[in-house]
Structure formats: structure tokens, C-alpha cells
From Swiss-Prot:
Subunit structure: Homodimer. Probably interacts with PlsY.
Protein name: Phosphate acyltransferase
Record keywords, A-Z: Cytoplasm, Lipid biosynthesis, Lipid metabolism, Phospholipid biosynthesis, Phospholipid metabolism, Transferase
Entries under Pfam families matching the protein: FA_synthesis
Keyword DNA-binding (UniProt): no
EC number(s) stated in the UniProt entry for this protein: 2.3.1.274
Length: 327
């Protein structure tokens, strides 16, 4: 397995990206292929592909197609040509998403690819889709998202994933017209796999395995979770310091438990987001990713390769297309 890494993507590129790639190369079986300027990548001790251009974080999406020798464009092309099995980038979402759909290409039957991420819940994880790619969607897009989310959850070991539609209430008649139409579509096509409407708190409670929503709401939910996780760890640290000697002793005795909790809540450990619905494995890392986050994103990419994520989505989409939904 080969995983290409965009050395120039992200707010902390190239240093943190290189560190993360090196960490991953020591832990994973996959060969890591760095994509970036020769002067930056040639002495890292890993395979590399030289590029001369950069898609900047504030570049408009079309720049990924114009800058054909950028690390992002070249990395996506490596996936499209089968020269690597996956590509990881912390670059800007807009260019990466457009590049993935245009260069790697969409799976037949998928109109709108989406960002899917597994976030921690009380029952293990919840797949959130769309996590930020499509701000406005139609009801049929949410059906596609649910099918891709089911495939992702199966890859993660859930035999019969249950799907919830993110809404402002659990009742069937809640939300605007498009959400009510989406509810009917999911109920018709998913059958027993459709749980119904869920609310924001259900994401981390693990009420369902897959939460489907538009990219605007999904991204707000994801960023809120990230902020809440940071708040919890910060408040705990402050409370321990303010509690005096006995609090410090108690914290020392519970250090392993606290470390496990902090690791589980750390946004860097679930920051690798698949672009689902394309004909290859592309993982979007957070723009502010440090080495730990990049290492995890590469690990996510390897998991997608091992579990044949693309094939699972390809298997899940056609049966709905042929079931008379009229599209």
C-alpha cells in the first residue's frame, strides 16, 4: 500500500506535515510518499514526488485545477492513475474537494460526494456526513450521504448501521420542507436501517451509527464538538489546580484514566475525514493539523484502503438507483 501526503497543505506546513508523515512511516505498513518541493522532501528519508507549485489555504477552489504542478493536484492525480492507494492533505477544503471530484472522479451514481468522519460517542463512534463539503443539498443528496455513511460504518465493523437525519426535533414533521422530504426518502429506501430524526446531542450519545446532514450543519456540529472537547480538558486542568494538594494527588492516581479520556476526546484523533463518493481514497486533515493529527489522518487512509471503502460504497449506491426512486 502506498499513501501520498501533501507536504504543502495546511496552516502548519511543511514542518508538522513532515513530522506526522515520519511518525506514520514508523508505525504503519504502508509506504509513505511525500508530495512537495524537492528541497523540502528529498532529505526526509521517504519516497517523494517533486512539485513546484502550492495551492494556498486562501486560494479559490479552481486553483487546484489551474496549478497542475501543485502538491495537491499531483497527489490527487497519483490516486487517479493508480500510482498510490490514497492521498492525505490538510489543504483548503474547497480546492481539495473540487480536485478530488474532478481529478479522481465520482463513483457512478453519486451526484454529490461528501465529507464523512467518525467522531467519538458513548457507544464507540458515530459517522457524521456531510461534515463540511456541501452547504446546500437536496433531499436525494441526503439519501446518497446515508448510503455512503452506511458503507463507512460497515467498514468500521457495524453489520447493520442505523441512520439518523439531523433535525431540530425527533418528530417526523419537524424541520423545513426539504428535511421532511428527505425523511420520507430515507424511510422508503433504508427500511429498518432508518432510525428517524435525531438531534445534535445524539451524535455523541451514539443513538445511531450514522448521522446525515447538510455540510453547513455538519461542519458547525463538528467544530462545536471540537470546542467542547477542548473546554472539558481545560476545565478539568483548572479544577485540579484550584483543588489544592488532595486534588493533585487524586489526579496523579487517576492519570492513566485521564490520559485515556483526553486521547478519546482529542480532535486530532478523529480529524481524518474521508471524501466519500469518489473513485479513490482521499482524506482531508484539519487545516491546523499538527504532526499527531497528520499521523492519524494517514492511519485513517490506510484503514480505508484495507477495508475496501470505495468498493463498499460502489456496492451500496446502485441498488437504490435501480429501485425506482425516479432519478
Amino acid at each position: 500500500m502506498k499513501i501520498a501526503v501533501d507536504v504543502m497543505g495546511g496552516d502548519r506546513a511543511p514542518d508538522e506535515i513532515l513530522k506526522g508523515a515520519l511518525l506514520a512511516s514508523k508505525e504503519l505498513e504502508s509506504e509513505i510518499v511525500l508530495v512537495g518541493p524537492r528541497e523540502i522532501v528529498e532529505n526526509a528519508g521517504l519516497s517523494f514526488v517533486e512539485t513546484t507549485e502550492v495551492v494556498n489555504m486562501d486560494d479559490p477552489p479552481l486553483e487546484v485545477l489551474r496549478k497542475k504542478d501543485s502538491s495537491m493536484h499531483v497527489g490527487l492525480k497519483l490516486v487517479a492513475e493508480g500510482k498510490v492507494d490514497a492521498f492525505v492533505s490538510a489543504g483548503a477544503t474547497g480546492p481539495l474537494f473540487l480536485g478530488a471530484t474532478s481529478i479522481v472522479g465520482k463513483i457512478k451514481g453519486v451526484e454529490r460526494p461528501a465529507l464523512g468522519v467518525a467522531v467519538p460517542s458513548l457507544k464507540g463512534f458515530t459517522v457524521l456526513i456531510d461534515a463540511g463539503a456541501n452547504a446546500k443539498v437536496r433531499p436525494e443528496h441526503l439519501l446518497d450521504f446515508s448510503l455512503m455513511g452506511i458503507a463507512y460504518a460497515r467498514v468500521l465493523g457495524v453489520e447493520s448501521p442505523r441512520v439518523g437525519l439531523l433535525n431540530i426535533g425527533s418528530e417526523e414533521n419537524k424541520g423545513h420542507e426539504d428535511l421532511r422530504k428527505a425523511f420520507s426518502l430515507l424511510k422508503e429506501h433504508l427500511g429498518d436501517n432508518f432510525y428517524g430524526n435525531v438531534e445534535g446531542h445524539d451524535i455523541n450519545l451514539g443513538t445511531v451509527h450514522v448521522v446525515v446532514t447538510d455540510g453547513f450543519s455538519g461542519n458547525v456540529a463538528l467544530k462545536t464538538m471540537e470546542g467542547t472537547a477542548k473546554l472539558i480538558t481545560s476545565v478539568m486542568k483548572e479544577s485540579i489546580k484550584e483543588g489544592g494538594l488532595f486534588s493533585l494527588i487524586g489526579a496523579f492516581l487517576m492519570k492513566k484514566s485521564f490520559d485515556r479520556m483526553r486521547e478519546r476526546l482529542d480532535p486530532r484523533t478523529y480529524g481524518g475525514t474521508f471524501i466519500l463518493g469518489i473513485r479513490g481514497i482521499v482524506v482531508k486533515a484539519h487545516g491546523s493539523s499538527d504532526a499527531k493529527a497528520i499521523r492519524h489522518a494517514i492511519r485513517v487512509a490506510e484503514r480505508g484502503i484495507r477495508m475496501n471503502l470505495v468498493r463498499e460504497i460502489e456496492r451500496g449506491i446502485p441498488h437504490v438507483r435501480n429501485s425506482g426512486d425516479g432519478r
